Amino acid sequence: GDISYLCATHNMDPMNPTEVYTVVFSPTGTSRKIAAAVAQGVARHGGSCNAAANAAAVPDAGTNAAASSVAKAFTTIDLTHAAGKPPVLPADAAAVFAVPVYGGRVAPAALERLREIRGEGTPAVVLAVYGNRAFGTAVAQLAAFVAERGFVPVAAGAFVGEHSYSTPGTPIAEGRPDAQDLAEAAAFGARIGQKLAHGETGPIDAAKLREPHTPLLSKLRFIRFVLGYRRRQKRTPAVLLP
């Protein structure tokens, strides 16, 4: 598969979040979709880390169906564009962070927009969305970043989204995340919700997250494409970040 994730295993006090926050930096919208699906799963308290079948169709983020299908309150903090200082997220809430991967790392612009976020021992899910090549150290980087700001990373995941370089002529993970991806994300979130309710709220080591195997030929083709893309960018630049 091309989805990787970790869940918390340490036993502490049971926790039932009163509110689920999604905190996203998502220029193309793919990270926002994954974050919304995981957050909906967290609120449902069901499913399995490895079984997307437990999550049926996932409503689109922001729809009435999505809001009415879960009991928890939802707040989206979208930091894609410059905004005011975000609120401090309380310890009785849960936060779902999602950012895109750029060159195996979290995009510097994402870290800049997230730097003012603060928690109070708030459990956090850290998610990286990558263009089907590699997520590198982005997940571990994001986990360390939010931990420094008062959050406890209790789960981590990496999901595929359509690459920002994708075009009709050279599609890269075209149409991702698709319905199956969102079902996987919701199932993952549901398992996290269960673990929180069972008191498994200790921090995870996001560095243990392993990438799916990528055939060498696919890597070489991608590298060739990127080199060509960069040459074209020098001639006719296209802005990929807001």
List PLM regions with ranges:
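Short, positively charged and aromatic/hydrophobic N-terminal segments
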Residues: I3-N11
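FMN-binding flavodoxin-like domain, especially the glycine-rich phosphate-binding loop
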Residues: H10-N54, P59-K234
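Iron-sulfur cluster-binding cysteine motifs and their immediate structural context
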Residues: L240-P242
